Each structure stands twice: as C-alpha cells, then as structure tokens.
Design a protein with these regions (language model features):
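N-terminal Rossmann-like FAD-binding beta1-loop-alpha1 element of flavoenzymes
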Residues: 5-33
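Short glycine- and Lys/Arg-enriched binding-loop motifs that mark or flank ligand-binding interfaces
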Residues: 8-13, 37, 43-46, 97
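Gly/Ser/Thr-rich helix-start
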Residues: 13-18, 42, 49-51, 93, ...
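Conserved N-terminal glycine-rich FAD pyrophosphate-binding loop of Rossmann-like flavoproteins
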Residues: 37-70
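Glycine-rich phosphate/pyrophosphate-binding loop regions near the starts of catalytic domains
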Residues: 64-66, 75-79
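Feature captures the FAD/FMN-dependent oxidoreductase FAD-binding
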Residues: 78-121
Length: 121
C-alpha cells in the first residue's frame, strides 16, 4: 500500500470543499480531497442552469444574518468576490452579469470545476 502524507484533508467536494482545497493548495499545502460522489463538483455542474452562478457582486457583510456578525465581515474581507472574479479572469473563463449582480460563465460550469481542480494539483 502506498503511504502518502497530506497537510490538509478536505471532506466534501462541493463548492465549499473545492474552494477550501484550492486555497490550501495555493498556499503550498499537500491536499487530499474526499467526496462520496463519483465526481467532485457534481452540484456545481448543474448550478445556474449548467453555467454556474459563481459569485455575486453585491455580496457584503451587512447582507448576512449571523449570531456573530463579525464572522461574515472577517470572512468576506479575507477573500472577496473580486478575488474570485480575478481568478476566473486569470484562467480565461468568459462570464457575464445577470440580475442583481449574479455572475455566470458564458460557457459551462465545467470550466469553474476544472479551474478549481487545476489549482489543487
């Protein structure tokens, strides 16, 4: 049996799990991503009618309800929707804005999943 060492194990290959794994990989961590589905990002592939509503330009801490209001402020300050848009642009993924700041891929949600998986390797 092969023995491999990982710095981070992420359980769940949905949007949040892929993002967590991607960010850890960007920071030089060796990441193992586990999911029960046969393919990670399966729900992302059907989101937004297959085009992935990948962020919203109107995301702001005051629009979230939380028992700890500082959590949203801190989380959104560390990685903003503009950071993700820049990443999408860097990977050459064309996108457009729909109603109320919703951003969608011009092509397929597969582009977002592929980008996140590439960032982990």
């Amino acid at each position: 049996m092969n023995s491999r060492t990982f710095d981070v194990v992420v359980i769940g290959g949905g949007a949040a799990g892929l993002m967590a794994a991607m960010r850890a990989g960007q920071r030089g961590r060796r990441v193992l991503l586990l999911d029960h589905a046969e393919k990670v990002g399966k729900k992302i592939l059907i989101s937004g009618g297959g085009r992935c509503n990948f962020t919203n330009t109107g995301a702001a801490p005051e629009r979230f309800i939380s028992a700890n209001p500082h959590f949203c402020k801190s989380a959104l300050a560390r990685y903003t929707q503009h950071d993700f848009i820049a990443l999408v642009d860097k990977h050459g993924i064309a996108w457009h804005e729909k109603t109320l700041g919703q951003l969608f891929c011009d092509g397929s949600a597969r582009q977002i999943v592929a980008m996140e998986l590439t960032m982990n390797s």
